[in-house]
Amino acid sequence: MLKILIPTLFLLPTTWLTSSKWLWPTALTQSMLIALGSITWLNNTTDTGWTALNSYIGTDPLSTPLLVLSCWLLPLMLLASQNHLSSEPMNRQRMYITLLATLQLFLILAFGATEMIMFYVMFEATLIPTLLVITRWGNHTERLNAGTYFLFYTLAGSLPLLVALLMLQNNTGTLSLLIIPYAKPLLLMPFGSKIWWAACMIAFLVKMPLYGMHLWLPKAHVEAPVAGSMVLAAVLLKLGGYGMMRLMIVLDPLSKEMVYPFIVLALWGVIITGSICLRQTDLKSLIAYSSVSHMGLVAGGILIQTPWGFTGALILMIAHGLASSALFCLANTNYERTHSRTMLLARGLQIALPLMTTWWFIASLANLALPPLPNLMGELMILTSLFNWSAWTLILTGIGTLITAAYSLYMFLMSQRGPLPQHMLALPPSYTREHLLMALHLIPLLLIILKPALLWGWFA
């Protein structure tokens, strides 16, 4: 654990002490070394599952894949942001890298926390760097509005969680994840325990986001700079799913009745947000709504609480993190060339940038869950566990899968095929940096096919 935490901490002085000429190469090299070092985590699962640094920080098979994903994403964010920050003053570039490094630090501490309150504090702390990145480096004036939505949705959702955790602490005397699965269930007034259950879940359902609490997400995604979109889609949404999995153990026997409305909402959301995607003209907005749709499946899988549901949810979270982050990078490469996110104004790019079309194709196929990609493994496991619970869910999930395929292909065809508009005849070529960025997103996704057991979490 320390071999990752200490270099991440030292990224901050590195950023401020390096000469301006070497700023990006050094930050990138150090973060890439951290990312490569974090892969060793996948190797050392102990018999109990927990590998603890001290009584507050440790890893287990559930948090390890998410930790590796968080570390893997920092160098990719730096690679993606290099171009659009090159015109900014040096101190602002340093500030930007500092914010991304602190965000990674908070994420490592959130996923590594074995104490519920520490997880809560880090869960909230990730808000600050993200908010600053969105409101300071976003592309349009609506970014302030988006930042406000992001802040207030998340804070309003997570205040009840704090109260619920304090009540749990009062009743059981501990909030350690190592002990709390063995504690007695919390018994409150007949209705009080139901409110307590909802308070525990709402914060994570807003973060995921569940359909109905998702309004902050498209706004935040569309207005954020590329690194903001990447980390939001790839890791911050996964904090919600991770928190739900951690708390689900404590919430039995209440969950049996309480999960029904949320599963219905999640599956309904898969269909509705998919349909919204079919009507989008804005590229980033389409990818953002597709995130809501995928996370709806994840929420359904977790709320079913079967081994298959949990495993499928974890696989889909990791796979979706890589695929949607790749799509945001591609949308950004388009935006940097055409200065427009509208799909009608930037089509026919296959003629101008043929190699980028290959990346678009692979990322779109990953998004629509083509076999044998891990996206399909996750979706199949979730569909099976939902079908096992009630056969009727197959109708909803089937329609959802169909719509996902439809909007993924629609996005690919709209942006890549067709005639090249007149105003786009002289585009700059694609850079090696962008190809490296896409390769580092999609190669891990393809390698997971060979050993999916790394992502099976508790049930490997």
From Swiss-Prot:
GO terms for molecular function: NADH dehydrogenase (ubiquinone) activity; ubiquinone binding. It comes from the Eukaryota. It catalyses: a ubiquinone + NADH + 5 H(+)(in) = a ubiquinol + NAD(+) + 4 H(+)(out). One of its GO terms (cellular component) is mitochondrial membrane. Its EC number is 7.1.1.2. One of its GO terms (biological process) is ATP synthesis coupled electron transport. Pfam families: Oxidored_q5_N, Proton_antipo_M. It is a multi-pass membrane protein. It is an enzyme of class 7 (translocase). Keywords: Electron transport, Membrane, Mitochondrion, NAD, Respiratory chain, Translocase, Transmembrane, Transmembrane helix, Transport, Ubiquinone. Core subunit of the mitochondrial membrane respiratory chain NADH dehydrogenase (Complex I) that is believed to belong to the minimal assembly required for catalysis. Complex I functions in the transfer of electrons from NADH to the respiratory chain. The immediate electron acceptor for the enzyme is believed to be ubiquinone. NCBIfam families: NDH_I_M. Belongs to the complex I subunit 4 family. This is NADH-ubiquinone oxidoreductase chain 4. It comes from Gadus morhua (Atlantic cod).
